[in-house]
């Protein structure tokens, strides 16, 4: 018996990396998965792989900055399966770090649109469906950058992830009465393409890893297992919380 048997899950940013692993894991745990991204070719391949493994999944085009795309994605979940139980706001971007006075307003707006506005829009459109289903679980992927560790963080990225952290707590407080839980996950350095693109300077990356007590990057599987826990009924008394997965970096 899977941890998500009978559940319907919607995942953003699911075409590759952590999002794809979430889609695959959730399907393996018995969920009926709807997942979206803007990388349609890669998303279709993930969809095919899940189905080949015996899981149930459908890919949809989802630009998280477009409200109409969210309406369609939630509509796909409820139209196909009659309900929505889980939302994973996974989609996010990072841009190369520059001093604040060199960052353009357009770059800032783009990061905030994907990372923060996308979480708001997904949550906004998931809540009515979850309310009709009698409750649900929303998991927002933030970052340790949203809590601290500011020295080497890109300013727009850190601000967007901090916004997610507080938005999560407000959502949890406002919708506990609807049976909707909302929690955030805060990974530190994780071995993904996005992390490596954020730290092209290998010397800087090495120095950052030296400050992690466990002495290594995290893995996608380690983050996905935490997301699965928060999505499942095993975490039924947890809401408004932040789960840090950083090898002990913030504990120093």
Give a label for each model feature:
Residues 94-97, 148, 228, 239-252:
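Short C-terminal tail/terminal secondary-structure segment
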Residues 98-100, 104-110, 208:
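Substrate-binding pocket helix/loop in short-chain dehydrogenase/reductase
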Residues 128, 173-174, 236:
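Alpha-helical segment proximal to the catalytic Tyr-Lys
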Residues 143:
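Residue(s) in the substrate-gating loop at a strand-loop-helix junction
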């Amino acid at each position: 018996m899977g941890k998500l048997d009978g559940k319907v899950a919607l995942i953003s940013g699911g075409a590759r990396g952590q999002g794809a692993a979430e889609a695959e894991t959730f399907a393996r745990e018995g969920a009926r998965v709807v997942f979206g991204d803007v990388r349609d070719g890669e998303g279709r391949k993930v969809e095919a792989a899940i189905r080949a493994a015996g899981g149930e999944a459908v890919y949809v085009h989802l630009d998280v900055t477009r409200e109409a795309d969210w309406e369609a994605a939630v509509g796909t979940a409820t139209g196909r399966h009659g309900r929505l139980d889980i939302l994973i706001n996974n989609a996010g971007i990072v841009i190369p770090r520059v001093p604040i006075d060199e960052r353009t307003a357009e770059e800032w707006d783009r990061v905030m649109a994907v990372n923060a506005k996308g979480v708001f829009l997904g949550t906004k459109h998931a809540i009515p469906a979850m309310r009709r289903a009698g409750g649900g679980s929303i998991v927002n992927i933030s970052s340790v950058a949203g809590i601290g560790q500011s020295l080497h963080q890109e300013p727009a990225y850190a601000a967007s992830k901090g916004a997610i952290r507080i938005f999560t707590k407000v959502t949890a407080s406002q919708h506990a009465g609807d049976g909707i839980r909302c929690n955030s996950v805060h990974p530190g350095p994780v071995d993904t393409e996005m992390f490596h693109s954020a730290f092209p300077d290998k010397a800087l990356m090495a120095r950052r890893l030296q400050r992690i007590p466990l002495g290594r990057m995290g893995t996608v599987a380690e983050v996905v297992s935490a997301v699965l826990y928060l999505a499942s009924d095993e975490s039924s008394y947890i809401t408004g919380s932040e789960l840090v997965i950083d090898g002990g970096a913030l504990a120093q």
